[in-house]
Design a protein with these regions (language model features):
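Active-site-adjacent helical/loop segments in soluble small-molecule enzymes
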Residues: 1-5
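Juxtamembrane helix-boundary/capping and inter-helix hinge elements in multi-pass membrane proteins
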Residues: 9-19, 105-110, 148, 184-187, ...
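Signature of multi-pass transmembrane helix bundles
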Residues: 19-189, 350-354
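Hydrophobic transmembrane alpha-helical segments of multi-pass transport and channel proteins
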Residues: 29-33, 37, 164-169, 202-207, ...
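Transmembrane alpha-helical segments and their short flanking loops
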Residues: 51, 250-354
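Membrane-interfacial loop-to-helix junctions in multi-pass transporters
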Residues: 88-92, 126-131, 165-166, 183-192, ...
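Helix-loop-helix junctions within the multi-pass membrane cores of secondary transporters/permeases
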Residues: 197-279, 336, 347-350, 354
């Protein structure tokens, strides 16, 4: 799933269609990386630990510094692609998906369509499996409560507060800075317009794709160039994944802190970049950001047995987490698309109205 989602997303990203679209893509990628970086440092400042089974063995074999992390990363990047798929070496899968995705950008439209169809088919299979998640969640909650008592729910609450806090911080603090850089005026009227007209709808639909028509209608009402937003809004639903980057990073950091694995600044930066890149493949399936957590955990030598427990914890808090994540992702598509075009207006001396 990771392989085809990321490869399809990058191959269909296409080439720049002008200065505005180039600016939008830069804003998308920068905001996603920034979200991951902020999530890492927020997790360091407000550490949260979870209750995980079979954690001791993983902690004993985990890397103890940046040298071991880089060694693991390098060996996984150059892993045989077939071996990476068979043995679930997520970093190797991601590296090959990126290389092939970029290579396929010059392929025929029929080839790109085939990649999209395959990724959608795999997504449907995974979605069917996810629909059975409540049964697994029931078992996980039962095991956690019988092992650790009702205080388990306090841990889940702290984790949820950290996730939502990071997402709100991105939307109300860092995104306004990006908007101000574009328009050189008070960004909050535009921030709240996108919040009211786009984020609320996305919160309840929990689907960036379903919110595309809403965002395009708002762009039309603001008088934006249709040739631009008809490209940037659907593209944003694929690669602008601030919320997904936060989810992957926070959940991975919580796992690392639970296992007592040390994380220095260089390792944190690598995790941020990896999470931002992985987030590009999170749009193809409901709860996609949670399913990419094992890939980030593999950077620290954490086994699938442990990382999939973390995914299960994510599904427990997923109703709120996924809703807020989608609201951030989709409203940011609108916000950054509009900001990039308003920047062009400002440079041309046109009046900016929103």
């Amino acid at each position: 799933m990771v392989f085809f989602l990321v490869m399809s997303a990058l191959s269909n990203a296409g080439k720049s269609h002008g200065g505005t679209i180039r600016t939008v893509v830069i804003l998308y990628m920068f905001s996603t990386v920034l979200a991951a970086v902020i999530a890492v440092f927020a997790s360091m400042i407000f550490p949260v630990e979870m209750v995980l089974q079979e954690a001791a063995d993983t902690a004993a074999s985990a890397p103890q510094g940046i040298v071991e992390v880089l060694s693991t990363l390098l060996m996984n990047v150059v892993a045989n692609p077939v071996s990476a798929l068979v043995n679930a070496k997520y970093i190797g899968i991601l590296s090959w998906a990126v290389l092939l995705g970029v290579a396929f950008r010059g392929a025929k439209d029929t080839t790109k369509a085939a990649l999209t169809d395959i990724s959608e088919a795999i997504s449907k299979v995974v979605t069917t499996i996810i629909n059975l998640a409540p049964f697994g969640i029931l078992g996980l909650v039962y095991t956690s409560v019988t092992t650790s008592g009702l205080e388990t729910f306090t841990t889940y609450g702290k984790l949820l507060v950290l996730l939502v806090g990071c997402m709100l911080g991105i939307y109300f603090i860092t995104n306004p800075l990006l908007v101000y850089w574009c328009i050189r005026k008070n960004p909050y009227p535009l921030i709240f317009k996108c919040l009211k007209q786009s984020a609320i709808t996305a919160f309840f639909t929990r689907s960036s794709a379903a919110n595309i028509p809403v965002n395009m209608k708002i762009c039309e009402e603001m008088g934006l160039d249709k040739d631009t937003y008809s490209v940037t809004i659907p593209l944003g639903a694929t690669i602008n994944m601030d919320g997904a980057a936060i989810t992957i990073t926070v959940m991975t950091m919580a796992t690392v802190q639970t296992l007592g694995i040390p994380v220095d600044i260089p390792t944190a930066i690598i995790l941020s970049l990896l999470a931002a890149l992985a987030a590009c493949g999170a749009s193809g399936v409901a709860g996609g950001s949670l399913l990419l957590i094992p890939m980030a955990c593999s950077l620290f030598g954490i086994s699938d047995t442990v990382s999939m427990q973390v995914v299960a914890v994510g599904f427990i808090i997923g109703v709120i987490q996924d809703s807020v994540e989608t609201a951030l992702n989709s409203s940011s598509d609108l916000l950054l698309s509009a900001s990039a075009e308003f920047r062009q207006w400002r440079l041309q001396g046109k009046e900016i109205k929103f």
